[in-house]
Amino acid sequence: MLDQPLTEFLERGLAIHMGTRNAALRPNGCRVTAVRVEDQGRNLVAFIPKAVTPAVLEDLRANGQAALSFARPTDDRAVQVKGEFISAQDADAVEEAFVLGQWQSLLEELALIGLAPLTSTSTWQMWPCVAVKLRVTAVFSQTPGPEAGSVLA
């Protein structure tokens, strides 16, 4: 479902947010530190900070639905990936460098548009993480312009 060019975009270090909802249809969400595309693009692992996971994980386990918004700050290219919850487990030490590497790439992107990391993100706790695995069900362009909302996969 996620081809190689899209995988490379998603894994480069972007501003990422995961949204879900509770049984009363109230939205819930969190920042995502990094993602990894797996299984030839059929699945995606979102690394979400442990500090913010309890309610999000509860909602994912209850309804199984998630939407991830990806945006590159320097040009506003954006993608939405919808998915179904497969599993969640603590991310391990081997994954830490990969995850924080993507986070560092986002900080570099933010610096290019004038948002210094020390002023905009210094209090965010981005590790340790929970690795949330999703089966990709739909992908949409969210880049502003005439193609916004178009199906990518």
Residue spans for each PLM region:
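Short, basic/aromatic recognition patches
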Residues: 1-15
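Charged, amphipathic alpha-helical segments
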Residues: 1-4, 49-55, 117
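Short beta-strand segments
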Residues: 11-49
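A generic structural signal for short beta-strands and their flanking turns/coil linkers
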Residues: 12-14, 42-43, 62-66, 77-84, ...
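Charged, gly/pro-rich active-site loop segments
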Residues: 78-153
